[in-house]
Swiss-Prot record:
A divalent metal cation 1 binds at H6, H8, E92, D203. It comes from Bacillus subtilis (strain 168). Its cofactor is a divalent metal cation. SUPFAM superfamilies: Metallo-dependent hydrolases. Its EC number is 3.1.-.-. PROSITE patterns: TATD_1, TATD_2, TATD_3. GO terms for molecular function: DNA nuclease activity; metal ion binding. Pfam families: TatD_DNase. InterPro entries: DNase_TatD-rel_CS, Metal_Hydrolase, TatD-like, TatD/YcfH-like. This is Uncharacterized metal-dependent hydrolase YabD. Belongs to the metallo-dependent hydrolases superfamily. TatD-type hydrolase family. Keywords: Hydrolase, Metal-binding. One of its GO terms (cellular component) is cytosol.
């Protein structure tokens, strides 16, 4: 009934109680989860998890903060792994100008290389954008990303940016921040965008929704995101759960 399109259950924060976290997700009717890998260790763990759990799928890519560490061998490795039937997207990828570990020019190169790879293997992409909207949108356009489409992960941008992304065949995914009291912009965007472009996520263990803000996030909390969106859209929780699940299945080509 619920589909968490972006989770990091491969993070060390779940090393001691992963089974309990998964049981709570099932109890809240979270039927599918995409676990996102963004470097060698997290990709390796995501690939293990898709073998261990039938309802978990993987997205594999390289996070922009760590772009400086990515090698040609890493890109080739991701390409090889992407042939697995339960790898449903390339990413997360993108640009992050909040942290300065990786220079902007290297981030851009790694971003472009991953878009090219996704087009080659015909998989959608998952976009991480922090303080870099203009450059992200420009690169998506220049690299012809609309050929594969994908997700603007944890979208907090303006309605204008949302429209530009949707024109390029992207879905907008909302997480915990849409439940925050001061989140005026994402709430307005949720009201405006068509239902067939809407996804939900947790980005756990980060960005925990109200009323658990400040604690470790987990997939069961995606219901609070769905509840908030239902309220904003003046729809029922069940309608939003169904719409966002069908959208995710369509994007990821899951029957």
């Amino acid at each position: 009934m619920l589909f968490d399109t972006h989770a990091h259950l491969n993070a060390e924060q779940y090393d001691t109680d992963l089974e309990e976290v998964i049981e709570r997700a099932k109890a809240e009717k979270v039927e599918r989860i995409v676990v996102v890998g963004f470097d060698r260790p997290t990709i390796t763990r995501a690939m293990e998890m898709i073998e261990e759990y039938d309802f978990i799928y993987a997205a594999i890519g390289w996070h922009p903060v760590d772009a400086i560490d990515m090698t040609e061998e890493d890109l080739a490795w991701i390409k090889e792994l992407s042939a697995h039937e339960k790898v449903v997207a390339i990413g997360e990828m993108g640009l992050d100008y909040h942290w300065d570990k990786s220079p902007k020019d290297i981030q851009k190169e790694v971003f472009r290389n991953q878009i090219a790879l996704a087009k080659e293997v015909n998989l959608p992409i998952i976009i991480h954008n922090r303080d870099a909207t203009e450059d992200v949108v420009t690169i998506l356009k220049e690299e012809g990303a609309e050929a594969v489409g994908g997700i603007m992960h944890c979208f907090t941008g303006s309605a204008e940016v949302a429209r530009e992304c949707m024109k390029m065949n992207f879905y907008l995914s909302f997480g915990g921040p849409v439940t925050f009291k001061n989140a005026k912009k994402p709430k307005e965007v949720v009201k405006e965008i068509p239902n067939d472009r809407l996804l939900i996520e947790t980005d756990c263990p980060f960005l925990t929704p109200h009323p658990f803000r400040g604690k470790r996030n987990e997939p069961s909390y995606v219901k609070y995101v769905a509840e908030q969106i239902a309220e904003l859209k003046e729809m029922t929780f069940e309608e939003i759960a169904s719409i966002t699940t069908e959208n995710a299945k369509r994007l990821f080509r899951i029957n």
